[in-house]
Each structure stands twice: as C-alpha cells, then as structure tokens.
Amino acid sequence: MTNIEASAAKRATRTFTCSDITPDEMDAFSATHPQGNFQQASGMGRVRQANGVAVSYLGFYENGELVAATQFEVHGHGLGTFAEVHDGPLADFHDRELTSYVFSQLRARAKAAGAAQLVVTPEKPYRTRNSAGEPLDAEGASLAGVPAGVETGPDDEGIASITSCGLAHEGFPVGYQAVPRWRYLKDLTGLADDKALLASYSKNTKRNVRIAHDNGVVVRRIGRDELGLFHDICELSCEKQGFENKPVSYFEQIYDAMGDAAEFNVAFIDTAEHLAIWEKKRDAFAADIAKLEKSLETARTPEKVERKLADVRKKHEAALRRVETAHKYETVGAHIPAAAALFIWHPRECVYLFSGSDATYAKFYAATAIQHHVMGECIERGCMRYNFYGINGVFDNPNDPGRGLLEFKQGFEGYVEELMGYFEMPVRPAV
C-alpha cells in the first residue's frame, strides 16, 4: 500500500465520539491547547452557573483520544433560549472532518436544550497585525514582536471550514463587542527581568513607569473584603467612558469561582512615601543652590554659574510646590487608591480584563504601574503571553473614542490579533 493509499485509508476509518467531560478534564485540555483561554475553563463556567447559565463540558474523541473540547452554555428559557460557546470550541478548524463533527454535535446539544440558535466566537486569530494594525507576513511578524510560529493569516480556510457546517459568519467589524474580536498582546519571551521589560516599552511609557515609581505608587493585590473599593474605582472610568460597570456581586463571583486565577490589583499612592520623596528632592535642590551661590563668589565664568543657579532655583520652587501638594494628599489618607485592574491567569496567558482609575491622580500613572507590575509577575512565573484584551480595531482615526485606550496599550509595544469573530447557526425554525 502506498503512502497516499494509507493516508486515504486512515481518513476513511476515522471514528469520532462525543461525551460529557469533567471540569478538571476541560481545564487540562484548555491548558495545553493552542487556543486555550480562561473563557474555556471551569472558573468562568462556575461564574456563569452562578448567574443562571446552564453549563456543560463536552469532549470530542477520535479513536479514544481527546482531540477537541468546549464549554457549552445554554442561556434563557422558552422561546428566548439560545446556546453559546465563548472563545471556542477548542478544535483544529483546518481539519474539516473534525470541525463538521464538532458542530453537528453542538447543534444537536443546542436543539435538545430547546435553543433557537447557536452562537460561537472561536479563539482563533484570523489575522496577526503589528501594533499599528497593519497586516503582517512571516518576515514582518518577527520584526513586530510576534512569537515564532504564530500564523499571520488571513485564515480564510478556517472560516470556510466553519461556514461549511451551516454557520453564518458575521464578517469583520470594528468596534467593541461582548467578546472582543480585536486583541492587543505582548510577547514577553526573552525578557529576563524588570530592566529588560522596561527597556521594551515606548519612550513615554518608560517615563510613566518611572514617574509612578518615583512618586510613591505601590501596587497591591487586594482581598475579597476590598472588592467594593475595586468596583468604585472601575465606576469612575465607566462614567467617563459611557460603559456600564459590573456590580460588586459579579466581582465577588469571579473571586470565589476562580480563586488564585483571579488577581484583583489596586495601585495606591503612599502619601508618606510621596512626601518623603519630594522633601528629599527639595533639600537636595536647596543644597545645590547653596553650593552654587558660594561658587559664584570666585567663579571665573559667573554667567555659567548664574544659568545653573536659575535652573536649580526653578526646580527647587517646583519641589516646594510638590511638597505642599503632598501635605494635602496626606489629609486624604495614608494610601490613596488611584487605579485598579483585574487579571485572569490561564496556563497559556495572563489576561487584563477589567480596570478603572481616578482621573484626579492621573499624573501618577498608577494604571501604567499596575501593567508593569503584572508583566513582571508574568516573567517570574514563566508566562510569556500577556493579553491586554480588547481594543476596537480602529487604528487610523485619532479622534476615535477608543484612541486613548489603544495608545495606552500600544505604549507597551505589543502586537494585534484579529480574531475570526461571531458565527451563528439556526437550530430551530423561527416561529
């Protein structure tokens, strides 16, 4: 038998089966699959169940080997029932036989649950882009900081495989969606320490990290009893950007369901430290002034000394003002919360999910400090994929409402994944 005949015989004898799997089995599969993500793990399953969603885990086997899996959700009741798969299923969509089997089983499950339709958003990039949103080829991917081996796309083959199973593709829209189609990421491979990490950022972001550090900003992981504070900081940003904040109870559900995988961080201004920093600078400038004034008496080129003296006096006056402001901050509290962010850890990546900041303290760059802190934690843990999560996919409009968020993330010098997007399959005829 020739190799071609053997390959054909193998395809002809492929046998697939589907069965329920345990949450632990789902987590193990998600941990090692190239599309594995926190939405396709049991922690988010528990969060959804706490909100009334029926959740199950399905495994797809070929000749006894688990080759695909998914968290399967059923929402609503009666005529409003629909089935959904967030950031899944985890499968090789270039394998058309497997893809066809997976979606036939998902449709059957959805139909048995009384769902009118099935909605899926695969965690599969359609195209990889550079930080400015420009499509990449294999050579450009290396220059843009994309990890080796990542497909640049476009993955028209994968989309064709899915649509051949009876699902309609939404297309390639821009804008924010419930499941972000546009993601901003940073590859941390090769960054051995904090110094190397900082050096990888843009000039402005490097400066902002240093400003935060030099002004007494400290990042601390908070406990469940402080989630009200986390919510309140997020509320400040939601009001400004026109988004609806999640209730405290939702953050409590994430905390309870995900355990150590959910990291709630708050960046505080240590007001005593902030005051001490500026008092030290004030005193140093005062000492410099005294030295320069003394040297002026015997200087050969007094005009140069006068220029230096004028510069130091300006810095001293600025330091005096900062000391005065620092005293006012002390009246607010010993530790002023300035920014907050939630991160979800998955064996494949760390995801930046929710955040907020107090614009009153914008010049402390506390939000930047949090990102730098957690990326440093990624390096310590050996997690090389840092997922800034959603952007809106608009790169060419400086007046776009999402521009500020995009530029904030771009400052960390990453790259963009444009995912396939939404697919929908009717399950029962419209009434």
Regions found by a protein language model. Give the residues of each.
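Short secondary-structure transition/capping segments
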Residues: 130-132, 182-183, 232-234, 398-400, ...
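A conserved beta-strand-loop-helix scaffold within acyl/acetyltransferase catalytic domains
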Residues: 17-79, 125-127, 165-178, 183-362
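Secondary-structure transition/hinge residues
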Residues: 34, 93, 110, 114, ...
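Acyl-donor binding region in acyl/amide transferases
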Residues: 79-176, 338-340, 344-412
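C-terminal catalytic domain of photolyase/cryptochrome flavoproteins
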Residues: 3-8, 57, 391-431
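Acidic carboxylate-rich catalytic motifs and surrounding loops in phosphoryl-/glycosyl-chemistry enzymes
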Residues: 122-123, 172-176, 221-225, 389-390, ...
